[in-house]
């Protein structure tokens, strides 16, 4: 099961994703509006999908269109904490490093990491426009 900020997502979970940025793993973009500077994590939970259906879903997931799945198959949530509990150890990939665990917590720590970005970087283009920077 997965619980984010008190909201539970039960049933068989196919994929649980905690994103603090738009891209990972060579171009996957599951949550296109995720930002590292907003003090929150964007969560994506995919439930009850067979391996074959997941293969069909992979393209949509990789280009930020996972939310187009019908009903409660795909849940999006923006928040500060995600806890995942499993009966058996499951594979968890954290920034490219793999570990196995039955329980894992992802928690946003606002201001916990400082970044330096080039002025006008596309990632912050909308923010730069609001402040008048180029």
Kindly give the residue locations of the regions a language model identified.
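Long C-terminal subdomains/extensions of small-metabolite kinases
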Residues: 1-134
């Amino acid at each position: 099961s997965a619980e984010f900020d008190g909201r539970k997502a039960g049933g068989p979970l196919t994929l649980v994703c905690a994103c603090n940025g738009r891209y990972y793993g060579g171009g996957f973009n599951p949550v296109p509006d995720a930002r590292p500077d907003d003090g929150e994590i964007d969560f994506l939970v995919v439930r009850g999908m067979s391996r074959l259906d997941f293969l069909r879903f992979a393209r949509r997931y990789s280009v930020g269109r996972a939310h187009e799945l019908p009903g409660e198959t795909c849940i999006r949530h923006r928040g500060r904490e995600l806890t995942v509990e499993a009966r058996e150890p499951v594979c968890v990939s954290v920034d490219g490093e793999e570990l196995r665990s039955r329980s894992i917590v992802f928690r946003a720590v606002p201001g916990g990491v400082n970044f330096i970005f080039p002025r006008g970087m596309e990632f912050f283009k909308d923010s730069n426009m609001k402040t008048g920077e180029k």
